[in-house]
Each structure stands twice: as structure tokens, then as C-alpha cells.
């Protein structure tokens, strides 16, 4: 039994072991120790590295290797391309900085470098590569500025000696002979050269200028005859116009005088009617509206009020209020008028009231006026007839 038990002991222990625990121990033994730096990794690699699929999501293949995600493969390819572009940009910038003098002296070296940078810029898709491209453009602009400064700025300057040599050659004079003649200014050949040279120069310069036409007068006629002056026509004097203008004020004055005379006659006639009424019945006052209102004509009523105002102004009549607070009119006697002038107590007022057509109708209806007291004169009856 002991032998069996001892014989079964190892097998029993082997069967009683946990298989999951044995696999975990074997994996822990097979792992190699990692340094802290390798365990942490850089922050950039942790950001750029795609998420690894878990063991539960992946299915083991026949070979035992895990399947890779296509998105992670594409991201790694893009990172490799961007890394290569940055490397090429840095190499190009270093080359430009080292070969600065050669680029400034060579003719097309700067153009070639710019074309190479344009080729790299077509592949730029991130900000890091764009920053390198901007840095290269700063260097290229500085080089272009220096090459522009090296250009000659005196291209339009005037070379006097060259111009004189060309001018003497055009005149047919040898510059060496002309120099000897200039030294000897007293020789007659010098005067001939100077005079003849200016003559040739003048004929040459004449072809480059437009000729100015001579000035001549244009009389406006083909035959050149002067126009015959027209005879002066004397305008008639404006004497008749002045006479007519002088006659118009006289006519107006006569019309004004005639209207004034007619007004005075009408005022005297109305005053006579008022005095006749009071002479017949001196104790009964005359109502102002009964006296001036014409029930058949509103314009005549207005004229009567206008004429009565002159009678009141001159002091031949007066207006007062009766017991019913209605206006009445009565003539002023001669004795009262004389007393007023002596004591200087008479007040002159011109009684004019505003009267509308509606007021006139209401007065006629209220006072029951059927016939006018102031009958129209013959002058007023003619237009109506």
C-alpha cells in the first residue's frame, strides 16, 4: 500500500495541479526583464501607436500569429512618408545654408532649389512639414534679396566718352585725329571739323523730329474776300412806350377818384336814410342788423356795413347796446356833435364787423328781415338788371 501510495503520489500531484497556474508561471519565466524606459515608452509613441486588439477579440490562426489591423498599417505608412519628407526638408535646408555662396554666384542654382522644394511641398499634409517648408522659404527669400542687390543699378547711366566716340565715328572723323586737332585749337582744320560735324549732326537729327506746319490765318472763305459789313439798322425810340406808361397812372388816378366819389355819395345817401327814419320816429331806436342787412343779397349787406363804418368814423352816427344787449344805431344831432368837438370828448371808432354767409342767413332768419332798409342805388341796380 505504501508502494502504491508512493507510486500514486507523483501522479496524484500531477493530476491535482492547476493547468492555468502552470501556463501563467511558464509565461512569466519566458518574459525577459524590461527597463523602466522601455516599459514606459515615449509619449509620442504612445499617442501615435494604434490600440492593440485584446486576446479575446483576436482569433488564433493556424500559425499562432495575431492578425494586424489595416488602419494601423496605413497609419504606419503615413508616418514613414512624413518622416521621410521631414528628413528631405532638413537635408535641403542644410544644403542651402552650407552652399550659400555658390547659390549667390551661380545663375540658376536658386531656381533649382526652389523647384525641389515645390516637389516636396506637394506631399506635405501635416503642420510639422509645413513649418520646415516655411523655414526654407525664409532662407530662399534672403538669397533672392541678396541676388537682387548684386544686379547693376546703373543700367540707364550715360557714358559720355562712348557717346563722343560714336558721334565722331558717325561724322566720319577718326577719334585719334580729332584729339590731335582739339589740342591745337588755332588750326583752321579744327573749325572745319566743328562746323561740318554740327551740320551732319543736324541733318541726322532732323529726321527724328516732326516738322511743324507754318501758321496761317483762316478767313472762312475760299476766295479770301472779307465779309461785307451789314448796314446798321437804327432801332425806333421808345418814346411812345414812355407816354403810355405815363398815361396809365393818370387813368388809375381818375378811376380812384371816381370810386372815391361814388363811395362818398353812397355814404351820404345812407346817412340821409338814417336821419329820415329818426326824423319820423325819434323815440324808437333802429336795430343795427335791421338797418344794414339786405335779405336778398349777401354782397350788398357787406357793402352796407362798409359804408356805415365811415358814418360812424366821422361821428355822424353811433352804435350802442340796448336792454337786450343787441346793437342799435342812431344818428348824432348837431348840438351833440358840437359839444363833443368843444370838449374834445368824442371818440372816433370805425365799426367794422366780420360776417360770414352762414351768419348772414341766421341773422335774416332770427330777426325776420323781409325787406332791406337801405334800398340799392341806381348804380347797383344796373349790373343786376
Swiss-Prot record:
UniProt feature, compositional bias: Basic and acidic residues: 10-21, 42-55
Compositionally biased spans, kind Acidic residues: 56-68
Pfam families on file: Nse4-Nse3_bdg, Nse4_C
Annotated coiled-coil segments of the chain: none
InterPro entries hit by this protein: Nse4/EID, Nse4_C, Nse4_Nse3-bd
GO terms under biological process: chromatin looping; DNA damage response; DNA repair; double-strand break repair via homologous recombination; protein sumoylation; regulation of telomere maintenance
Region (Disordered): 1-69
PANTHER family registered for this protein in UniProt: NON-STRUCTURAL MAINTENANCE OF CHROMOSOMES ELEMENT 4, NON-STRUCTURAL MAINTENANCE OF CHROMOSOMES ELEMENT 4 HOMOLOG A
Entry protein name: Non-structural maintenance of chromosomes element 4 homolog A
Source organism (scientific name): Homo sapiens
Amino acid at each position: 500500500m505504501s508502494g502504491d501510495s508512493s507510486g500514486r503520489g507523483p501522479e496524484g500531484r500531477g493530476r491535482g495541479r492547476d493547468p492555468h497556474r502552470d501556463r501563467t508561471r511558464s509565461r512569466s519565466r519566458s518574459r525577459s526583464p524590461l527597463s523602466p524606459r522601455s516599459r514606459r515608452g515615449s509619449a509620442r509613441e504612445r499617442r501615435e501607436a494604434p490600440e492593440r486588439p485584446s486576446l479575446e477579440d483576436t482569433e488564433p490562426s493556424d500559425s499562432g500569429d495575431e492578425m494586424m489591423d489595416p488602419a494601423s498599417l496605413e497609419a504606419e505608412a503615413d508616418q514613414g512618408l512624413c518622416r521621410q519628407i521631414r528628413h528631405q526638408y532638413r537635408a535641403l535646408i542644410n544644403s542651402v545654408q552650407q552652399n550659400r555662396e555658390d547659390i549667390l554666384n551661380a545663375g540658376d542654382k536658386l531656381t533649382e532649389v526652389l523647384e525641389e522644394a515645390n516637389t516636396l511641398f506637394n506631399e506635405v499634409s501635416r503642420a510639422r512639414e509645413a513649418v520646415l517648408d516655411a523655414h526654407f522659404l525664409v532662407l530662399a527669400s534672403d538669397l533672392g534679396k541678396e541676388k537682387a542687390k548684386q544686379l547693376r543699378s546703373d543700367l540707364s547711366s550715360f557714358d559720355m566718352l562712348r557717346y563722343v566716340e560714336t558721334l565722331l565715328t558717325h561724322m566720319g572723323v577718326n577719334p585719334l585725329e580729332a584729339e590731335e586737332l582739339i589740342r591745337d585749337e588755332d588750326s583752321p582744320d579744327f573749325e572745319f571739323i566743328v562746323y561740318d560735324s554740327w551740320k551732319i549732326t543736324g541733318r541726322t537729327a532732323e529726321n527724328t523730329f516732326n516738322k511743324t506746319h507754318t501758321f496761317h490765318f483762316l478767313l472762312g472763305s475760299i476766295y479770301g474776300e472779307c465779309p461785307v459789313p451789314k448796314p446798321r439798322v437804327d432801332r425806333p425810340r421808345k418814346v411812345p412806350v414812355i407816354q403810355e406808361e405815363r398815361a396809365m397812372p393818370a387813368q388809375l388816378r381818375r378811376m380812384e377818384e371816381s370810386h372815391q366819389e361814388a363811395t362818398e355819395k353812397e355814404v351820404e345817401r345812407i346817412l340821409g336814410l338814417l336821419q329820415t327814419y329818426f326824423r319820423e320816429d325819434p323815440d324808437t331806436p333802429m336795430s343795427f342788423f335791421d338797418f344794414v342787412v339786405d335779405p336778398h343779397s349777401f354782397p350788398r349787406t357787406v357793402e352796407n356795413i362798409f359804408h356805415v363804418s365811415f358814418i360812424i368814423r366821422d361821428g355822424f352816427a353811433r352804435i350802442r347796446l340796448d336792454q337786450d344787449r343787441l346793437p342799435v344805431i342812431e344818428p348824432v344831432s348837431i348840438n351833440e356833435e358840437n359839444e363833443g368837438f368843444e370838449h374834445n370828448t368824442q371818440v372816433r371808432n370805425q365799426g367794422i364787423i366780420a360776417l360770414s354767409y352762414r351768419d348772414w342767413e341766421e341773422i335774416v332768419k332770427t330777426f325776420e328781415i323781409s325787406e332791406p332798409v337801405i334800398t340799392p342805388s341806381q348804380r347797383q341796380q344796373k349790373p343786376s338788371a
